[in-house]
Amino acid sequence: MARHTQLRNNRRRGQRTSTLVALTVLLIPILAQDNKRGFAYVGDANEADNNMLTSSRTPLKWYYNWAPSPPPQVPSKNLEFVPLIHGLDEASSDSTSRQLSALPDSSTHLLSFNEPDGTTKSGGSSISPEDAAKAYIEHVAKFRDGSSGGRKWKISHPSVTGSGNGLEWLKSFNASCYDIDSENGCPTDFVAAHWYGAFDGLASWLGTLDEFYNTNGSREGDDRLKIWVTELALPQQDAQTTVQMMNSTLPYLDGLDYVERYAWFGAFREGDANEWTGDGVALFDDDGELTELGALYLGGEQNGFAVGQKGDGEGAAGQLLQLLVELDLKQVLR
C-alpha cells in the first residue's frame, strides 16, 4: 500500500491519465469476458499448472472433477467448484449428501449422471434410462428441493454423449420420468452436454438439444433451459487444426445466449492425454509450458498468458497487468 501511495505522489497528472488509458485498453478484453469458461480437472498433480489455471487473470470462473467434492490440488478461492453425481451409487449415498452440504455457498449447481449412455470403461456411468429416471426422482431431485445436500441445488439432467445414441437415451429417459411421475417428470434447471468433434458438429448438437428441451417443450423466455457444455474437445487432430477449432468455438459459445457455461477437456499435460483424444487437446506440454491452445484458452497475451509460459513464472504482460490492476484507480485520478 505504501508503494502505491509513493507512486501516486510521484506521478504527474498527465502520467496518471496515460496510466488510466493504458489500463482501460488492457482491461477491455478481460471485462468483455463473461463467466462462461471453466475447465474439467482430470487430476493434474503439477502445482505450477494448477496455479496458472486458478489465476485470477484468466477468464476461467468454474471447474469440476466428476465428483461431489473438490480435489485438494486445486486452490479454489478464485473459482466456483461444481459437484457431480457420477452414477447410481453416488446418487443414493449418504456420503454424497454430506459432501455437498460441506461445500461453500459459492457452489450452487449440481451435475448428474455422467454419460449414462456410455460404458464405464470410457468414463461413462452406463445406466439404463429407466433406472436413471427412478434414481433421479428418488434421490437427485431431493437436492433440488433442499431436502438433501444442505441447500437447494440447481440440478442438471444427465449429460449424455454427443451422439444419436445420446439423444435417444434422453428421449427414453424423459419418457420414463413421466411414466413414474406423470405431472412433474424429472424436474431440472439446466442441461449438460458433451461434444468431441469439429465446430460445425458442435453447433448442430447444441441446436438439437435446444430444440429437444426448449422448442419442443414450449419453453420460452426465462423458462428456457440453459446448456452447459461440460466436456469439449477435438480428438485426434494436430495442434494447428485444434487451435482453429477453438478459435471458432470460443466466440460462438460466448455469444450464444442459451449456452451458460463451457469447459475444455484438456487441462493437463500432453503426456497425460488419453489415447482416444490424443495430445492435441492438452493445454500444457510435457514441460508444463502453455501450448498455443492453452494460451488461447487462458485469455492470451491480453490477459498475460503466452505460448511457452510456465505456471511458476509470470510473463511480462501478466506482470504489467497485475501491477495496474492493483492500483487504486480512484486515487490515481486524484
Placement of each model-derived feature along the sequence:
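Fungal secretory targeting signals
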Residues: M1-D34, E314-R334
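Active-site groove signature of glycoside hydrolases
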Residues: P104-P129, W153-G164, C186-W195, W228-V229, ...
